[in-house]
Amino acid sequence: MQYPEPISKLIDSFMKLPGIGPKTAVRLAFFVLSMKEDVVLDFAKALVNAKRNLTYCSVCGHITDQDPCYICEDTRRDKSVICVVQDPKDVIAMEKMKEYNGLYHVLHGAISPMDGIGPEDIKIPELLKRLQDDQVTEVILATNPNIEGEATAMYISRLLKPSGIKLSRIAHGLPVGGDLEYADEVTLSKALEGRREM
């Protein structure tokens, strides 16, 4: 079906979002058209505001509106422990359980040779630099329990073994093939408690 150009552009824009196919994009576009103009303008402003005012922390890579982020700036945090995660959403998931008090390092991805993503394409060099500069005694590998997450954890483990830094991996209370962001606080808490040395 041929839509007027403004609707077609809106549909195309929605289809650029992950998990949004043609049918869902059409539904979203027509829903937006049915909304009051002030609500649509607020939505558009929120999108632009987020894009303009959010950045990644220069220390840990978490999403933030200040640099360094509130976690890296918090003097009450245990600076001797770094929890390595794949995405900023994983930091938010870990923080929800309110049990971990160390710092984070966000890799912004995982090693995936099938997708052409190697160790140099994610924030592993930045992690190694942090470990030289900081007084870190433990690294918790909290990458997702899927093939890419496991490969990334094993790669980092091999790199860090000679350093003498204590290495642990969160326990697999998380389902294999799952993502941290979808886990509830109890599951994450048990996974963190049951981490093992590597």
UniProtKB/Swiss-Prot annotation:
The keyword Acetylation does not apply. Gene3D superfamilies: 3.30.60.80, 3.40.1360.10, 6.10.250.240, RecR Domain 1. Keywords: DNA damage, DNA recombination, DNA repair, Metal-binding, Zinc, Zinc-finger. Transmembrane segments: none annotated. Residues 80-175 form the Toprim domain. A zinc finger (C4-type) spans 57-72. The keyword Lyase does not apply. One of its GO terms (biological process) is DNA repair. It holds the Pfam family RecR_C. It comes from the Bacteria. One of its GO terms (molecular function) is DNA binding. May play a role in DNA repair. It seems to be involved in an RecBC-independent recombinational process of DNA repair. It may act with RecF and RecO. Belongs to the RecR family. PANTHER family: RECOMBINATION PROTEIN RECR. This is Recombination protein RecR. It comes from Bacillus licheniformis (strain ATCC 14580 / DSM 13 / JCM 2505 / CCUG 7422 / NBRC 12200 / NCIMB 9375 / NCTC 10341 / NRRL NRS-1264 / Gibson 46). The lineage of its organism: Bacteria, Bacillati, Bacillota, Bacilli, Bacillales.
